[in-house]
Amino acid sequence: MKKKYLLASLLAILAAGIYLYYFHARIYQEISKANLKSPDKNQTFLIGADMDFQKNIVYAALGDSLTAGVGVLNYEESFPYLIAGKMAQDGKKVTLKDHSIPGAKVGDLKDKLVSAAIADNPDIITILAGVNDVHGKVSLAEFKNSYGAILKRLTEETDAKIYLVSIPFIGAPSLMMPPYNLYIDWQTKKFNSVIKALAETYKAQYIDLYSPTAAQFKTNGAHYSPDLFHPSAEGYAIWAKIIYG
């Protein structure tokens, strides 16, 4: 009897593992099929240049494909550009420096982007990163160490005001099927708790993007681009409004 119970348990675990592996692979197959590209980026944009503003704000945006604007055709529809536009409307000339690598994990930002961002001598920095760590099964400890190393350098080597944007839930239900969607949601919350704690440690401002958008982004709709993972122009506009406040 015990042997039968043990065998049944092992088979159930094996079946669950195969199921999760299949849907994990399927997600990336579907995203790849959409073949979305990053919009053309000059990496530097000047917003409000035609206006007579005395103050020029340098805004450095660090992140992955979500900062690069994957899902839209023009970088002007990305959330960093939309935020820079809102700053200009408030009477500031803004130099936007895009520092993003689609597919990047936080460790990649640490190794490849931070030095360039520091060289910009920015006044404002946003970091939206971690979704690839969540999906890439990076450990919480590694994530915390890499993110902390980024913040240590930014706080020591710049005078910028730093905004840490929480990892949003992304993945339409037709792409992220249960129970994988539940697992990703659970992991996202855990990683966000690390970001929030780091914000307190390094005196950065934490912006909760997860809570006000999770319900909507757990549904299909026009807020998603064709790959059902990256936001559309409508989705990025929602994010920009929340991030800018």
Segments (PLM) and residue ranges:
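Generic structural signal for well-ordered alpha-helices
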Residues: 147-151, 192
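Catalytic His-Asp segment of secreted/periplasmic serine-dependent ester chemistry enzymes
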Residues: 170-245
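N-terminal secretory targeting modules
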Residues: 1-60, 244
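A short helix->loop->beta-strand "cap" motif at the edges of active sites that frequently abuts
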Residues: 157-161
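Active-site-proximal beta-strand/loop segments in catalytic clefts of secreted hydrolases
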Residues: 62-64, 99-102, 128-131, 165-168, ...
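Surface-exposed cleft-lining segments at the edges of enzyme active sites
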Residues: 69-70, 99-106, 131-141, 178-184
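Oxyanion-hole/transition-state-stabilizing segment in secreted/luminal serine hydrolases
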Residues: 106-144
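Serine-esterase "nucleophile elbow" of acetyl-processing enzymes
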Residues: 32-100, 115-121
